Amino acid sequence: MTSLTQFEQLKTAGYNTIPVYRQRLADTDTPLSVFARLKDYTQAYLFESVEGGENWARYSIIGLGESTVFSCNAGQLTIKNAQGNITTQSCADPFQYIRDYQSQFKVPPHALIPDLPQFTGGLVGYFGYDAVRYIEPRLSNVPEADPVGLPDIWMMLSKTVIIFDNLKDTLFLIVHANTTDEEAYQRAQNQLDYLERLLATPVSLQAKKHKAPHFESLTGKEKFLESVETVKEYIRAGDVMQVVPGHRMVSDFDGDPLQVYRALRHLNPSPYLFLVQGHTLTDNTPFHIVGSSPEILSRLEDGIATVRPLAGTRPRGKTKEEDLALEQELLADEKEIAEHLMLIDLGRNDVGRVSKIGKVQVTDRMVIERYSHVMHIVSNVQGEVRDDIDALDVFKATFPAGTLSGAPKIRAMEIIDEVEPVKRGIFGGAVGYLGWHGEMDMSIAIRTCVIRENKVYVQAGAGLVADSNPESEWNETQIKARAVIKAVELSSNGLIL
């Protein structure tokens, strides 16, 4: 608990944004029951994690967005400030805007408040795949506008956070106080009192049935198969070694995004489980992003940058023996191994761009991780970053993931622009946070759906190399999308298994 004396000491030390917190038992609450009490807020999020597809991680994070939100689309930066006023300006480099914006918050380092988890707030949201166009000038040939209608980048300021310690069955209630306000400490205490009252209110998680979904590919199988052949021609010509084209599926939706999240965390527990809800600033319509991504884009923590290439896929077996046979088949597949080794090299190169010389290493090499419907080959690449590098530098060096673009990365993305009919939107981008202390954790937006204006969208891709079989690659996209589609179906049935 933050005392008034401690608060004043931190204020005197020059910190202008100070976490005021309480810790209490949470043995009768769950992250889901807490989020259910917050889900009517305009901006909110829920982050959970299952490590290796099997064990729940220590912390679950529930956050409320503040009034401050910003988004960027087609070079236009739209900002909603703390007073609710909205302005728009041209912006060639949104990353510099983010860097400048975050620099105004002087938050005490973790060492001064060691009881708190590493992440206690910051900026939360997403970078869509097309955010790469603010990084790489060659990618200026933008496909048609994304009919889903979400911006390339969307971030909310998060200063009110509830963090579950799943190991100790406790939770932290955290409110960040602005010390320029003379009543800041008392206002923070009042907000904590409000959160306590909110958590004490009854909540129902009773799921309701709604209209069953019917997903259709907007590209269609025939056009996807044609795109595979087009990509293979580029590979044969020596233009590129690998490309990862995808396609989008859509269905009508009149259900509850939280039910979809509950279904997805049951069906496909993953390292990155997330539900992000917000409103677009241009037309003030709500959206929800629900995902169970198995793959990190990049992480920066304690000066170590991490990427975790995931490539090589098989469906899960129906029996333990079949599952093991499929694992052995996957590890013996020369195409899959070649593709994965290519992506390890790409990950080493990306991390190497921001790391000290000789400080990049592969810490895990080609291990199998199992999820509900698929198994993958996974490796882990880490680097000790240079002293002049920050989280956004790491993000820009690693974005987008090679597993969602190809190699060489920029040429592969040019080909994706050619064969995919519209902007990708969130698919292949990243969802996560930029913390107060320079830490970052971003997952790749795969195994993810977007819910907006009574529609639900699911996308999936396939990594193509020279000997790819078009029919097999189409089937791979169906396998990858299966968990999310099944989650939408399960939610429509009232979560009755």
Curated annotation (Swiss-Prot):
<dbReference type="InterPro" id="IPR005256">
    <property type="entry name" value="Anth_synth_I_PabB"/>
</dbReference>
<dbReference type="InterPro" id="IPR015890">
    <property type="entry name" value="Chorismate_C"/>
</dbReference>
<dbReference type="GO" id="GO:0046872">
    <property type="term" value="F:metal ion binding"/>
</dbReference>
<feature type="binding site">
    <location>
        <begin position="271"/>
        <end position="273"/>
    </location>
    <ligand>
        <name>L-tryptophan</name>
    </ligand>
</feature>
<dbReference type="Pfam" id="PF04715">
    <property type="entry name" value="Anth_synt_I_N"/>
</dbReference>
<comment type="function">
    <text>Part of a heterotetrameric complex that catalyzes the two-step biosynthesis of anthranilate, an intermediate in the biosynthesis of L-tryptophan. In the first step, the glutamine-binding beta subunit (TrpG) of anthranilate synthase (AS) provides the glutamine amidotransferase activity which generates ammonia as a substrate that, along with chorismate, is used in the second step, catalyzed by the large alpha subunit of AS (TrpE) to produce anthranilate. In the absence of TrpG, TrpE can synthesize anthranilate directly from chorismate and high concentrations of ammonia.</text>
</comment>
<protein>
    <recommendedName>
        <fullName>Anthranilate synthase component 1</fullName>
        <ecNumber>4.1.3.27</ecNumber>
    </recommendedName>
</protein>
<comment type="pathway">
    <text>Amino-acid biosynthesis; L-tryptophan biosynthesis; L-tryptophan from chorismate: step 1/5.</text>
</comment>
<dbReference type="InterPro" id="IPR006805">
    <property type="entry name" value="Anth_synth_I_N"/>
</dbReference>
<feature type="binding site">
    <location>
        <position position="463"/>
    </location>
    <ligand>
        <name>chorismate</name>
    </ligand>
</feature>
<dbReference type="InterPro" id="IPR005801">
    <property type="entry name" value="ADC_synthase"/>
</dbReference>
<comment type="similarity">
    <text>Belongs to the anthranilate synthase component I family.</text>
</comment>
<feature type="binding site">
    <location>
        <begin position="461"/>
        <end position="463"/>
    </location>
    <ligand>
        <name>chorismate</name>
    </ligand>
</feature>
<dbReference type="GO" id="GO:0000162">
    <property type="term" value="P:L-tryptophan biosynthetic process"/>
</dbReference>
<feature type="binding site">
    <location>
        <begin position="312"/>
        <end position="313"/>
    </location>
    <ligand>
        <name>chorismate</name>
    </ligand>
</feature>
<keyword id="KW-0479">Metal-binding</keyword>
<keyword id="KW-0822">Tryptophan biosynthesis</keyword>
<comment type="subunit">
    <text>Heterotetramer consisting of two non-identical subunits: a beta subunit (TrpG) and a large alpha subunit (TrpE).</text>
</comment>
<feature type="binding site">
    <location>
        <position position="49"/>
    </location>
    <ligand>
        <name>L-tryptophan</name>
    </ligand>
</feature>
<dbReference type="GO" id="GO:0004049">
    <property type="term" value="F:anthranilate synthase activity"/>
</dbReference>
<keyword id="KW-0057">Aromatic amino acid biosynthesis</keyword>
<feature type="binding site">
    <location>
        <position position="339"/>
    </location>
    <ligand>
        <name>Mg(2+)</name>
    </ligand>
</feature>
<keyword id="KW-0456">Lyase</keyword>
<feature type="binding site">
    <location>
        <position position="447"/>
    </location>
    <ligand>
        <name>chorismate</name>
    </ligand>
</feature>
<keyword id="KW-0460">Magnesium</keyword>
<dbReference type="Pfam" id="PF00425">
    <property type="entry name" value="Chorismate_bind"/>
</dbReference>
<keyword id="KW-0028">Amino-acid biosynthesis</keyword>
<feature type="binding site">
    <location>
        <position position="476"/>
    </location>
    <ligand>
        <name>Mg(2+)</name>
    </ligand>
</feature>
<dbReference type="InterPro" id="IPR019999">
    <property type="entry name" value="Anth_synth_I-like"/>
</dbReference>
